[in-house]
Amino acid sequence: MKQFILSCVLSVAAIAPSQAQQTTRQLPVYLDQTKPVEQRIDDAISRMTLAEKIRIIHAQSKFSSAGIPRLGFPDFWTDDGPHGVRPDVLWDEWEQAGQTNDSCVAFPALTCLAASWNPQMSRIYGEALGEEALYRGKDMILGPGVNIYRTPLNGRNFEYMGEDPFLASIMVVPYIQGLQSKGVSACVKHYCLNNDEEYRHQVNVIVSDRALHEIYLPAFKAAVEKGKTWGIMGAYNLYKNEHNCHNQWTLNKILKGDWKYDGVVVSDWGGAHDLEQSVKNGLDMEFGTWTDGLTMGATNAYDNYYLSMPYMKAIQAGKFTQKELDDKVRRVLRLFYRTTMNPNRPHGFLCSESHYAAARQIAEEGIVLLQNRNNVLPINTQKVKRVLVVGENAIKMMTVGGGSSSLKVQREISPLDGLKTRLGKDGIEVDYARGYVGDVTGNYNGVTTGQNLEDKRSEAKLIAEAVEKAKTADYVIMFGGLNKSDFQDCEGHDRKHYELPYHQDKLIEALAKANRNFVYVNISGNAVAMPWKAKVAGIVQGWFIGSESGEALASILTGDANPSGKLPFTWVNSLKETGAHALNTYPGTWRQKGGASTKGNIIDEEYKEDIYVGYRWTDKERIKPTFAFGHGLSYTQFSISNLRSDKMQMKQDGTITFTVNVKNTGKRAGAETVQLYIHDVEASVDRPQKELKGFQKVHLQPGESKDISITISKEALSFYDEASSSWKAEAGKFEALVGNAADNLKLKKAFELF
């Protein structure tokens, strides 16, 4: 009997592989995971009808596009980032869907991530965000943003990675890799030249090819060539009089031609304006168009999108062939195979403790200690008995607002609560005074903070209360700055002024006079004017840092964590210290009278400062800013010494490695960022005095030292040559400048390229 059973088992075992092989052979190629993806795409395209091709290249709801049910391709779902997964909205409109499971962890804004100067933080950020997106059923996160910080008035700077193209290029790549390692597509935005918000739909940017390639494109190029991003979002603005969501130069020539990009180009919501340009100039997926019938309460208006029925009818009428359509479909199917049709996507997690820990770690590494006179920080918790906290930003929830990056969170710890919890452990009394009243609404697009911030007291009474309490406190910590309301750090508008709103300057001066241990914490994604800087003991740049805001800030202020952030932009004294404002090119010149109220009017904005953005401009004009690019202090001290190189002459196809010794000479563990800049001593064209071309963050215990090496190739020495439309590295003399900030480069090493 046992022998009979064994024979049966062996017979079945022998048959099973044959049946499995037969089943595999019977699978259509587009479903056969053993086949190359491009072959599967070819097979899928051959099976699709014209209508099926059209249906996958435009939206079917606010944030989704249709799949191909007949062939087993599911719908594709996007959602806003880049700091967390946006709460779900209604199918056709922007109102909240009213779900109870669409909260998220709010991660620090990307200015804070960039300020960490730590690519490892970018990887952690991307992975955690990808896991949250997976749990929420999202296939693409609309981010990260890498538009360059050209003016501190840009309302959306907080979503970007600063002024320097090299820093942004290094920081964006691990974010993309981390996110896409979870099977969720990045959608790097806003490509390109979307450097201010106020007239973003009407701005036609006039910029030299050199500035375009040296300043505004490198981070996008890195996202494509090194990050291998699967998605790129076009920008609202125009370049060479064509909107960037369907622009023959930026999309067809540069992105898909020069960079060989194989992913999809997604329109920004409402960024498509023309059928023929949408077909021929590189747009692959159209989302959010509010023209052609999509108005409040309308349904099924997606058929009116340019890449929907108008496109299909034009093909049927012979106006277009299916050549362009098949390229769009190929790219979308490639995206499907990377995401929705990827059987190896992991499981997602939502609001896990590991994600909160990641958010806190990123925040702590990105917070910047700007000024620390007389070592006023960290707070000595063994000697202090009473701390006064001042300012609306100490209690205001900052995850709500700011535009499309607004989030709904399960938890957000305010700075006041964070300090109460931390200082309470040492028996320290924490008092609070409002100081000023700003935006008390606490809601955005149907998501509310649940806070009641109404306060009818006069400015004089608010300041008087704060000053009176400050006189008897051991420390005064004010949380001020901006918020995410219109005309501050918010999408759709730019700031009206460089100065702090709500008369905060007056409050700061009064508090600094009342208490010598006064620390100002600036909560913003932008620089602000600081006319009172010399009167203030401590200044901290606190950013918008999300769910763990209070915990992270309390850790930095008390010394539980040692600040190591560095500024990702130059903190100027006034707007006139930036090229865009010094040359009066912002926000541009209207072509017709009537400005934005004139239908079809365009505003031309010429980037006359050319390549001289940020520290490149202040160097050129010999301006000493409030705080330099790359500036950031620590509670310990470091020495950077013994700069040497592995050679004195570098070949065109070679590399050169620079090495320095970094030592923690203080009494606390901490981290320092070694920054390498290159100076072209003799060039045939005008070049900046220096440009960042390498950096490395190193964590050291007290007394510990390490050698840090940075290797560069001729790419770091090149400029964009407009005559040949190519990058050029000229033979000659160069200098490597090394230090810990753009204004603190004490080491120099000469070398030659031949």
Please provide the spans of the model-predicted regions:
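Acidic/proline-rich low-complexity IDRs
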Residues: 2-5, 9, 506, 582, ...
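Glycoside hydrolase catalytic-domain context in secreted enzymes
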Residues: 17-719, 726-742
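Short beta-strand elements
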Residues: 744-754
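Bacterial Sec-dependent N-terminal signal peptides
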Residues: 1-26
